[in-house]
């Protein structure tokens, strides 16, 4: 298969302005490194790992209250030791060299009109919350749990915790009580910050009873502090303190926050990231891969229950500002976020592949009137972006927009592969492997392959890998999660292909692979074909084993209003899969469903649904509290009772 023609190339002027160009020139001047291409730069960054991360420290002037003894102490994974002996402050770097009158963030929600906070305001709010927490006895190592939405007060609360050395953990207010208790209960927070309610899709949701249930159930909580968001009253009286913002010098590996896995098949894994590792990774990612420049305004739709919120806050390490939105991105229609882009002058619009697909299916024309003159980049993540999604962005937004699809994980709070502002964009491909990320595709024997689909592995340590899972005293849960297949090598659980030119293609989760007649295929290839059928809005495909046969592969589809799953549509779906994927991967059956089950972060629930249809008890296969639409499971539970798919 030949190389697809680029959909976009940076102009010479744009490539010259990119921070990564300045960085490469600096490497040549200070280290004599003449790296003529991005691929050469990437290879150097993973071959000379210590030298690369030392260059990031020097180029971005990372400051330490105590200097590190070396870049890497223990090198083996898991347990690589980064910058032993160093002390620094993540929060101090966020606020460093910021003009108090410049804008730090812009915000909007279904409850509030668009507004903005200057750096002076953000610092003032952060100082007041930090003083309030200190008055409650919060100090270094204490956990502060937040049941807060994506609003400026939440950013300030996180930075307040970081300044004190307290460990932050957040859950979005739409999470149910059981889901939040399953998360916060594991880390035993001292303080719970929570809202009274929120508005979503035009409806008000009072969460006071849920908050009380959480506070009563998480027995470590000594103090509940309420933020009146729904009623507009703000922080409860007496909470905010006074005084200047101070920054506690902390060990490089001091925990910054606890994130969580989806928890679809058990208690969510509490993933702990060190403040120094996140600092280095976010400096690299925001500057060199997002190309966040002074004056830029970056947005990524997220809730506080998804790592993209933490990722977006990291952009504040640059001289760009960020844009926050709290609410339903489809209310009152799919034009809401595009209108926000126009009103806030966004330069980068970050979203999910599913949102782009929805806009495309709805026939949306976000820039039909030329309302997005400042938009220079669009980012996509969450799942592989279909080729049609690439084409739709360029058809709608024009040839000058840089579209970067990116893939990573909560586990590392960053992307392994994705945007490179100086490389061309090709349909269906991610531009390159991230600097310092030794991404490879491995076959089952542990051999690196190019031009073939393999397991996505990371063969060298990264600073933002988890320092541990909370409560995993012997590290067994951590090792089992990433290192059980290839000892000492991080196996992420995705299928990936590295092309001969260094781009990447993600094919979906390797634990939900379709295997037909010995030919393996990622589910994303089938979804790309199916979602190209105009009447299909969403889909779920499974490969179910059967005794004595090659298995049974059903396809479940969500149709647009008014569409009917008749013989003609079934034939069209199968024909598209046969032509765009492979004749081997035409489904045995096509069925209509109302919704595809998804996690709270939007991921399709392939493996748990497969387990239900193979006879696993629903409560063991999936935690309903971890789902965005738990009622979508009911269809599959009923279906599993109709027949035994494993034997029929």
Regions found by a protein language model. Give the residues of each.
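Structural core segment of the AMP-binding/adenylate-forming
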Residues: 159, 163-237, 344, 352-353
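Conserved AMP-binding A3 loop
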Residues: 115-120, 248-249, 256-280
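Conserved AMP-binding/adenylate-forming
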Residues: 132-181, 288, 297-303, 342, 376-503, 509-513, ...
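AMP-binding/adenylate-forming catalytic core of the ANL superfamily
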Residues: 146, 171-196, 211, 330, ...
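Adenylate-forming
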Residues: 149, 191-210, 326-330, 346-392, ...
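AMP-binding/adenylate-forming catalytic domain of the ANL superfamily
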Residues: 223-226, 548, 579-604, 617-646
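Conserved AMP-binding/adenylation subdomain of ANL enzymes
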Residues: 277-297, 307-347, 362-363
């Amino acid at each position: 298969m030949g190389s697809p023609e680029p959909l976009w190339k940076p102009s010479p002027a744009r490539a010259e302005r990119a921070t990564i160009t300045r960085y490469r020139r600096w490497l040549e001047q200070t280290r004599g490194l003449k790296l003529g291409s991005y691929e050469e730069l990437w290879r150097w960054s993973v071959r000379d790992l210590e030298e690369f991360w030392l260059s990031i420290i020097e180029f971005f002037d990372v400051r330490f209250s105590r200097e590190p003894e070396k870049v890497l102490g223990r090198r083996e994974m898991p347990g690589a030791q980064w910058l032993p002996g160093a002390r620094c402050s993540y929060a101090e770097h966020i606020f460093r060299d910021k003009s108090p009158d410049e804008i730090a963030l812009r915000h909007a929600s279904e409850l509030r009109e668009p507004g903005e906070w200057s750096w002076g305001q953000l610092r003032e709010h952060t100082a007041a919350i930090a003083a309030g927490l200190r008055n409650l006895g919060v100090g270094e190592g204490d956990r502060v749990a937040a049941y807060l939405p994506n609003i400026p007060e939440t950013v300030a609360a996180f930075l307040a915790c970081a300044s004190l050395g307290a460990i932050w953990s957040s859950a979005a207010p739409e999470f149910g009580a059981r889901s939040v208790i399953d998360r916060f209960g594991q880390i035993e927070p001292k303080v719970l910050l929570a809202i009274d309610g929120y508005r979503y899709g035009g409806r008000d949701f009072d969460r006071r009873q849920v908050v009380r249930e959480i506070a009563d159930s998480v027995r470590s909580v000594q103090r509940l502090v309420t933020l009146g968001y729904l009623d507009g009253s703000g922080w409860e009286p007496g909470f905010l303190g006074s005084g200047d913002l101070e920054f506690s010098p902390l060990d490089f590996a001091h925990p910054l926050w606890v994130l969580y896995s989806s928890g679809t098949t058990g208690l969510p894994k509490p993933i702990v990231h060190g403040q120094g590792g996140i600092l280095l990774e976010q400096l690299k990612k925001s500057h060199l891969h997002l190309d966040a420049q002074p004056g830029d305004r970056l947005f990524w739709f997220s809730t506080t229950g998804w790592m993209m919120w933490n990722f977006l806050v990291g952009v504040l390490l640059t001289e760009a500002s960020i844009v926050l939105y709290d609410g339903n991105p489809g209310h009152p229609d799919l034009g809401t976020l595009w209108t926000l882009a126009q009103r806030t002058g966004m330069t980068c619009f970050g979203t999910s592949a599913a949102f782009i697909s929805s806009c495309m299916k709805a026939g949306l024309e976000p820039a039909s009137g030329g309302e997005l003159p400042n938009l220079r980049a669009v980012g996509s993540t969450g799942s592989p972006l279909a080729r049609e999604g690439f084409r739709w962005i360029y058809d709608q937004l024009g040839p000058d927009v840089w579209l970067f699809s990116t893939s990573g994980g909560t586990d590392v709070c960053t992307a392994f592969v994705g945007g490179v502002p100086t490389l061309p964009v090709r349909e269906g491909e991610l531009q390159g492997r991230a600097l310092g990320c030794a991404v490879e595709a491995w076959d089952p024997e542990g051999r690196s392959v190019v031009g073939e689909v393999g397991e996505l592995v990371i063969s060298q340590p990264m600073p933002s890998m988890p320092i541990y899972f909370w409560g995993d005293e012997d590290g067994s849960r951590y090792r089992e999660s990433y290192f059980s297949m290839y000892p000492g090598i991080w196996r992420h659980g995705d299928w990936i292909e590295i092309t001969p030119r260094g781009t990447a293609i993600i094919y979906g989760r390797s634990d939900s692979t379709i295997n037909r007649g010995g030919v393996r295929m990622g589910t994303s290839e089938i979804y790309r074909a199916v979602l190209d059928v105009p009447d299909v809005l969403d889909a779920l495909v499974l490969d179910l084993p059967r005794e004595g046969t090659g298995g049974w592969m059903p396809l479940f589809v969500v149709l647009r209003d008014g569409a009917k799953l008749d013989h003609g549509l079934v034939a069209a779906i199968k024909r598209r899969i046969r032509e765009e994927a492979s004749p081997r991967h035409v489904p045995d059956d096509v069925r209509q469903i109302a919704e595809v089950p998804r996690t709270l972060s939007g991921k399709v629930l392939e493996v748990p649904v497969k387990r239900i249809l193979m006879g696993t008890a629903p409560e063991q296969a999936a935690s309903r509290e971890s789902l965005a639409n738990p009622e979508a499971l009911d269809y599959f539970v009923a279906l599993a009772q109709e027949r035994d798919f494993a034997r029929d």
